[in-house]
């Protein structure tokens, strides 16, 4: 097990930052070895920009980043190259992946992970008190970068979101009580399927889940002429798999009980985080391989369940 004893009161200097970034990349290796093979492949590498108070540290920057920002190499070892440069922007908090259509941008059609320091993250999100919590948040977002490195995913994402904007699903959930109730019931059926003790019971819960889901999608299409199927499948894959990485990393780090972390598997304001996460857990229990195709076909999770339900 990898261990890092830094906490939010640690003095922030260059050596502290480099140590934190080394730790993040060691955890990335652990995820590759224990959870998702290919995560550390060179062709899947995503530059990481760490925002300190007065400067930025960039891990494995692209040539475009180095051409746009004067940077000094401050650490190099085992495929991890860390550069220091001026602060790239004045946005107070970062914890996300960016990718744009602007040709002059450093993230033109390629993902870049951006994160604030542990200290700034703790100020913005008070629950973040340890480096493990901070690093797990980073890994959730970094996995989004990994997703966009998969062939065809960016194009599929843009096409689907163009037809059904990302805020559509949360709006339906917030504004339509019947929609919200159906989501809650669907998620409960997924949880029951995960906890089922025999295959027949599991299949019965899966069938009930699919019937309820199909009914909700049909109703929303009839009411507003909106087909949410592809958008829902996309967002469950996108956010569900990133939450799955969080879960597996928490478990790897130890001293973790899923039962006590209900936010991971219960429905929040963006329900597809939980339903997507639970779909992956259910396929794990069924022994279904999905890692190799989940980002090339957004129907992967549901298609697998439909095939296994009878």
Where are these regions (language model features)?
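Post-HExxH zinc-binding segment in Zn-dependent metallohydrolases
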Residues: 149-228, 232-254, 276
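Membrane-interface helix-loop-helix junctions at boundaries between adjacent transmembrane segments
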Residues: 126-134, 154-158
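Active-site recognition of the HExxH zinc-binding catalytic motif
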Residues: 136-149
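Start-of-domain marker
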Residues: 12-89, 93
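Short, well-ordered loop/turn and helix-capping segments at boundaries between secondary-structure elements
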Residues: 148, 152, 285-288
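Bacterial Sec-dependent N-terminal signal peptides
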Residues: 1-16
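Active-site scaffold of zinc-dependent metalloenzymes
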Residues: 72-131
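Pan-zinc metallopeptidase signature
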Residues: 18, 22, 30, 211-310
């Amino acid at each position: 097990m990898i261990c890092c004893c830094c906490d939010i009161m640690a003095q922030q200097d260059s050596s502290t930052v480099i140590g934190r970034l080394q730790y993040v990349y060691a955890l990335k290796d652990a995820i590759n070895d224990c959870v998702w093979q290919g995560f550390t492949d060179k062709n899947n590498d995503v530059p990481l920009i760490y925002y300190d108070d007065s400067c930025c540290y960039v891990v494995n920057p692209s040539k475009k980043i180095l051409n746009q920002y004067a940077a000094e190499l401050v650490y190099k070892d085992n495929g991890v190259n860390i550069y220091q440069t001026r602060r790239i922007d004045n946005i107070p908090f970062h914890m996300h992946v960016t990718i744009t259509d602007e040709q002059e941008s450093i993230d033109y059609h390629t993902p870049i992970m951006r994160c604030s320091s542990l200290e700034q993250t703790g100020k913005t999100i008070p629950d973040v008190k340890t480096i493990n919590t901070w690093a797990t948040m980073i890994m959730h977002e970094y996995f989004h970068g990994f997703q966009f490195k998969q062939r065809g995913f960016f194009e599929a994402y843009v096409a689907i979101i163009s037809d059904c904007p990302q805020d559509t699903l949360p709006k339906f959930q917030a504004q339509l009580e019947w929609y919200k109730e159906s989501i809650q019931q669907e998620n409960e059926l997924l949880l029951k399927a995960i906890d089922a003790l025999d295959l027949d019971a599991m299949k019965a819960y899966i069938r009930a889940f699919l019937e309820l889901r199909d009914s909700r999608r049909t109703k929303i299409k009839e009411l507003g002429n909106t087909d949410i199927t592809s958008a829902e499948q996309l967002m469950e894959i996108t956010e569900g798999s990133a939450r799955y990485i969080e879960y597996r990393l928490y478990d790897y780090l130890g001293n973790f009980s899923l039962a006590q972390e209900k936010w991971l598997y219960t429905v929040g304001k963006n329900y597809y985080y939980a339903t997507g996460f639970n779909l992956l857990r259910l396929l794990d229990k069924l022994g279904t391989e999905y890692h190799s195709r989940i980002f090339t076909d957004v129907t992967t999770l549901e298609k697998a369940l439909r095939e296994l339900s009878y």
